[in-house]
């Protein structure tokens, strides 16, 4: 009888220890999830910034990588990539370097095409069109004979100018992940076509699918902040061997080169 009571007591203590350990792990995971969301919210709070010149006065995260007196450079990049069945993959986007020291901005509009040759080797070609930004307008710095392309560049809007994540905390069933070895972290959400940002993308791009996208927010580097790390947004509408349709966006603050 005494042996039986001791056995029951031992089993009770083991179960209690397992329960406490599980609660501790769950609490730690919840704390990490919260930290990841807070980290992303700092970047997402930049959306929208309708006037790109506002970045001249926006301060980003600074660390020992910055030299004394360097105010830093914002790097803004928006790109749409489309590959439909039987056609080459094409990406069109613009990257802008906003130098807070000189209060000048330069960048490139980039058109890239990818395909496989008859032997199955990947091939690509890329064209870059240099631009500058003045008075919140994108201006090509070299003549462009193609009027349609020139207007596309001049009318280009970055996602940060119209995207809005004020409802990010209402997104449900997010898949939060963290890899301490890199370190890297991400949050993935299934969006609907009624989502504000999805509507904005469809308004500006000819997206050849009615499928609603998944939103992936990802970053790397120290969760507390790092000028070495990067943060990116990716709206993936379709992703398979035959078709790929996705939009990527990033805003990063770096030491001026």
Swiss-Prot record:
The keyword Plastid does not apply. A lipid is attached at residue 23 (N-palmitoyl cysteine). Residues 1-22 form the signal peptide. GO terms for cellular component: plasma membrane. It is found in: Cell membrane. PROSITE patterns: PROKAR_LIPOPROTEIN (PS51257). InterPro entries: Csa, Csa_sf. Its main location: membrane. Gene3D superfamilies: 2.50.20.40. A lipid is attached at residue 23 (S-diacylglycerol cysteine). It is a lipid-anchor. Keywords: Cell membrane, Lipoprotein, Membrane, Palmitate, Signal. Belongs to the staphylococcal tandem lipoprotein family. This is Uncharacterized lipoprotein SAOUHSC_02789. It comes from Staphylococcus aureus (strain NCTC 8325 / PS 47).
């Amino acid at each position: 009888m005494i042996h039986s009571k001791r056995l029951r007591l031992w089993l009770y203590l083991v179960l209690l220890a397992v329960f406490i350990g599980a609660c501790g792990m769950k609490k730690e995971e919840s704390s990490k999830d919260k930290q990841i969301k807070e980290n992303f919210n700092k970047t997402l709070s930049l959306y929208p910034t309708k006037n790109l010149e506002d970045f001249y006065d926006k301060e980003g995260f600074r660390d020992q990588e910055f030299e004394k007196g360097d105010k830093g450079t914002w790097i803004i990049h928006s790109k749409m990539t489309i590959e439909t069945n039987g056609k080459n993959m094409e990406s069109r986007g613009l990257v802008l370097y906003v130098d807070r020291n000189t209060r000048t901005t330069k960048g490139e509009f980039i058109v890239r095409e990818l395909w496989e040759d008859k032997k199955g080797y990947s091939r690509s070609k890329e064209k870059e069109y240099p631009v500058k930004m003045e008075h919140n307008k994108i201006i090509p710095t070299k003549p462009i004979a193609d009027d349609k392309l020139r207007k596309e560049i001049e009318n280009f809007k970055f996602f940060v100018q119209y995207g809005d994540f004020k409802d990010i905390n209402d997104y449900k069933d997010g898949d939060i992940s963290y890899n301490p070895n890199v370190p890297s972290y991400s949050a993935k959400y299934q969006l609907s076509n009624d989502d504000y940002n999805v509507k904005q993308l469809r308004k500006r791009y000819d997206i050849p699918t009615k499928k609603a996208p998944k939103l992936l927010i990802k970053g790397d580097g120290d969760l507390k902040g790092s000028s070495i790390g990067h943060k990116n947004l990716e709206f993936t509408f379709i992703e398979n061997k035959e078709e790929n349709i996705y939009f990527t966006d990033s805003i990063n603050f770096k030491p001026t080169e």
